């Protein structure tokens, strides 16, 4: 499809202006995968289309549930049309199961501890500083978001988590945690934005960590081989296929 000017490019996607509508943008998913704030980077042919397919499925489900997201359409597997947003530089994380960075930061908490309700955390998007955690008061004081926006991000992120958790639970998959982002559209409305794909969560079939289907498999590899990358591609394909069921019921 036709693209406008390039607005931004990250490790896994490129954002373009819409060629005719200034309220829209176009996201093109790349085949890149990275970990460690970009210290480890590889290319997996076809990953962009699989990530785009998963993201489109997730956002379609959320839109149907009445969540305000930036997603408009996915004309191609690796392409999304979205409402153009000024992104808020925060990762909003909800955790059901203690694992990953949480237990490294909180060694007194046993891995597998269940949080009910889900535990909410905010992180500043800053690779150079390794995405430092922020409190709501710090976010407000630094002018990153208003108090009302922080409250809205907290409530909407939990709603999104619970919807996705329920969808995964129907397939006997435990959603351990979920990272999402928000942006303001051209009218100032706060929307769930960016992408939600297999890089955004930890998912354990049957609640068994060793059966994980997500990006953590790539993070955990001591050495990345072509065979390892193919294993990761197959996992992303499985997740895309599984999320197809969320919108094709």
Curated annotation (Swiss-Prot):
Belongs to the SAICAR synthetase family. The lineage of its organism: Bacteria, Bacillati, Chloroflexota, Chloroflexia, Chloroflexales. CDD domains: SAICAR_synt_Ade5. This is Phosphoribosylaminoimidazole-succinocarboxamide synthase. The keyword Nucleus does not apply. GO terms for molecular function: ATP binding; phosphoribosylaminoimidazolesuccinocarboxamide synthase activity. Its EC number is 6.3.2.6. The gene is purC. It holds the Pfam family SAICAR_synt.
């Amino acid at each position: 499809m036709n693209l406008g000017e390039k607005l931004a490019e990250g490790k896994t996607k490129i954002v373009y202006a819409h060629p005719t509508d200034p309220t829209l943008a176009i996201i093109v998913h790349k085949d890149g995968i990275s970990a460690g704030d970009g210290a480890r980077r590889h290319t997996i042919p076809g990953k962009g289309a699989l990530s785009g397919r998963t993201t489109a499925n997730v956002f379609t489900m959320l839109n149907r549930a009445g969540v305000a997201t930036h997603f408009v359409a996915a004309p191609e597997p690796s392409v999304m049309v979205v409402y153009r947003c000024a992104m808020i530089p925060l990762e909003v994380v909800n955790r059901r199961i203690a694992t990953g960075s949480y237990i490294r930061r909180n060694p007194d908490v046993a891995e597998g501890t269940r949080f009910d309700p889900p535990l909410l955390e905010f992180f500043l998007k800053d690779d150079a500083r390794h995405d430092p955690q922020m409190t709501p008061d710090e976010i407000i004081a630094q002018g990153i978001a208003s108090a009302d926006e922080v409250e809205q991000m907290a409530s909407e992120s939990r709603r999104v988590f619970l919807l996705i958790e329920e969808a995964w639970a129907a397939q006997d998959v435990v959603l351990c945690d979920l990272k999402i982002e928000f942006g303001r559209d051209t009218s100032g409305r706060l929307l769930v934005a960016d992408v939600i794909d297999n890089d955004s969560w930890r998912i354990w079939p049957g609640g068994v960590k060793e059966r994980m289907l997500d990006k953590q498999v790539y993070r955990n590899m001591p050495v990345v081989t072509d065979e390892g990358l193919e294993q990761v591609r197959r996992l992303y394909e499985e997740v895309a296929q599984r999320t197809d069921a969320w919108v094709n019921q």
